[in-house]
C-alpha cells in the first residue's frame, strides 16, 4: 500500500520572546548576561552605553581588532545606543525609551536611578506595565544596600568562597564570575515570572530586586540547615564532594578524571573495575555513611589504580562498568569534542570587526522556540540613529 505524501514542514515558530522590548542599562556581567539570555530567545534588547567609553567589558581580557572577544558573546542580539545618563538630555531620552519598553535591566548601585529621576515610582507612572530588574551587591534594602559590591564580594558573603580551595588554605576563586552569572540567571527567572504575571493578572509591572550575595546563597544547598540543626560549619574540602563518597578527582598519567561512584550499586561496580572487589563486598561500605567513614582509604585505592592509566583508559574501563566518570576539560578539549558540536554548543559567529570567532551555543534547548543568534555584537552607538 502506498504511503500518503509527507506533510509539509511546519513554518518556523516565532521566537518565544518576540515582541518583548528590553532596555539594558547594566554593564560588565550581571545585567548584560540577563539581557543576553533574553535576547537569545527573541527579545529586542536595546543596550544603553556611555558615549565614547561604552561598557567596560568591551576592553576586558583578550582583545582582537580593538574589542574583547568576550564582548562578542555577551552582547550578541543587542542594539547599542550611546546616551550620557548623567546629563538631563540623556535621562529624558532614556525615559522615552523606557516608556515604550516591557523590561528594564540595570545593575547600578542602589539610588543611582533615583538620582536620575528614574525611580520605580516615576517609571511606573510613565509605564505601569514595566518589569524592572535591579541587580546590586546587597539589594535595594537593608543596612548594607549602599556599600559597593561586585560578584567576588557576593561570592564571599554568600558563603561560596569559604567552601572553595583546600582545607586551611586561602579561599580560591571558582575560575569564572559565577556570582554575577548566578545573579543574572535569578534575575532572568524574575523577569520571565513577572512578564507572565503581567499577562495573566492584569497588566501591571513590578520591581525585581536581586542581590549578588543572595543569588550565591540560594545555591548553598544544606549549608544553613546543617548549621541550624547541628551547629556544623561546613568547611572547604578541596576536590571532594563532602559527605558523599566516593566522589573526587583522581590522577592519571596524562591528566585528571572526576569519578562519581557514590551510589551503592555503582560503588560495587567501581570497586570491581579497579580490582578491589574486597572493598565492594565490605558490609560497612554498602551505604554512604560507611563509605564516608573510610573515604580516605577508598580515594587512595581509586587514585592508585587511576595513576597507572591514561585518562582514556580510565574512562573506557569505568564506562564499561557503568560508573559515571569524566575528563577534566580544558578549552581545547571542549573545542575538539564532537558531543559539543552535535548539540550546537560551538557556533561560528561573524563579528562586525571582520573576523569570525567560535562562541558558546544557546542554553537551554527549546524544541518549538529555540534560541538563535540573530545579530553580532554591536559597535558602540551602532543603533543610536535607528532607535532614536
Model feature map: region roles:
Residues 1-190, 194-201, 379, 383-386:
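N-terminal helix-loop segment corresponding to the beta1-alpha1 unit
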Residues 245-321, 325:
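Aromatic-enriched alpha-helical interface/lid elements that frame and gate functional surfaces
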Residues 71, 237-242, 247-248, 354-357, ...:
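Short Gly/Pro-enriched turn/cap motifs at secondary-structure boundaries
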Residues 2-13, 286, 354-388:
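Flexible, small-/acidic-enriched active-site or ligand-binding loops
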Amino acid at each position: 500500500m502506498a504511503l500518503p505524501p509527507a506533510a509539509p514542514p511546519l513554518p518556523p515558530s516565532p521566537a518565544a520572546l518576540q515582541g518583548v522590548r528590553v532596555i539594558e542599562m547594566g554593564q560588565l556581567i550581571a545585567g548584560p548576561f540577563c539581557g543576553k539570555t533574553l535576547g537569545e530567545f527573541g527579545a529586542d534588547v536595546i543596550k544603553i552605553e556611555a558615549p565614547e567609553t561604552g561598557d567596560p567589558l568591551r576592553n576586558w581580557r583578550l582583545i582582537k581588532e580593538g574589542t574583547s572577544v568576550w564582548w562578542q558573546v555577551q552582547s550578541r542580539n543587542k542594539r547599542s545606543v550611546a546616551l550620557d545618563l548623567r546629563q538631563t538630555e540623556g535621562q529624558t531620552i532614556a525615559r522615552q525609551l523606557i516608556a515604550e519598553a516591557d523590561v528594564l535591566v540595570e545593575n547600578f548601585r542602589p539610588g543611582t536611578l533615583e538620582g536620575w529621576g528614574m525611580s520605580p515610582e516615576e517609571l511606573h507612572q510613565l509605564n505601569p506595565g514595566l518589569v524592572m530588574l535591579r541587580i546590586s551587591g546587597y539589594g535595594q534594602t537593608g543596612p548594607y544596600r549602599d556599600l559597593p559590591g561586585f560578584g567576588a564580594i557576593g561570592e564571599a558573603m554568600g558563603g561560596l568562597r569559604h567552601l572553595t580551595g583546600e582545607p586551611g588554605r586561602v579561599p580560591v576563586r571558582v575560575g569564572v564570575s559565577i556570582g554575577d552569572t548566578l545573579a543574572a540567571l535569578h534575575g532572568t527567572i524574575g523577569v520571565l515570572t513577572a512578564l507572565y504575571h503581567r499577562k495573566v493578572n492584569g497588566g501591571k509591572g513590578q520591581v525585581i530586586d536581586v542581590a549578588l550575595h543572595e543569588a550565591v546563597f540560594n545555591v548553598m544547598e544544606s549549608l544553613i540547615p546543617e548549621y541550624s540543626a547541628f551547629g556544623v560549619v561546613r568547611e572547604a574540602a578541596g576536590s571532594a564532594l563532602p559527605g558523599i563518597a566516593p566522589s573526587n578527582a583522581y590522577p592519571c598519567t596524562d591528566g585528571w578524571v572526576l569519578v562519581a561512584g557514590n551510589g551503592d550499586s555503582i560503588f560495587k561496580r567501581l570497586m570491581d573495575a579497579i580490582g578491589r572487589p574486597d572493598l565492594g563486598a565490605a558490609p560497612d561500605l554498602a551505604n554512604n555513611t560507611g563509605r564516608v567513614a573510610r573515604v580516605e582509604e577508598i580515594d587512595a585505592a581509586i587514585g592508585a589504580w587511576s595513576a597507572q592509566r591514561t585518562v582514556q583508559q580510565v574512562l573506557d574501563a569505568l564506562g564499561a562498568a557503568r560508573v559515571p566518570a569524566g575528563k577534566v576539560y580544558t578549552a581545547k578539549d571542549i573545542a575538539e569534542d564532537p558531543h559539543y558540536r552535535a548539540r550546537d554548543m560551538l557556533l561560528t559567529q561573524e563579528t562586525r570587526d571582520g573576523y569570525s570567532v567560535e562562541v558558546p551555543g544557546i542554553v537551554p534547548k527549546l524544541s518549538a522556540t529555540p534560541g538563535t543568534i540573530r545579530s553580532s555584537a554591536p559597535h558602540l552607538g551602532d543603533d543610536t540613529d535607528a532607535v532614536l
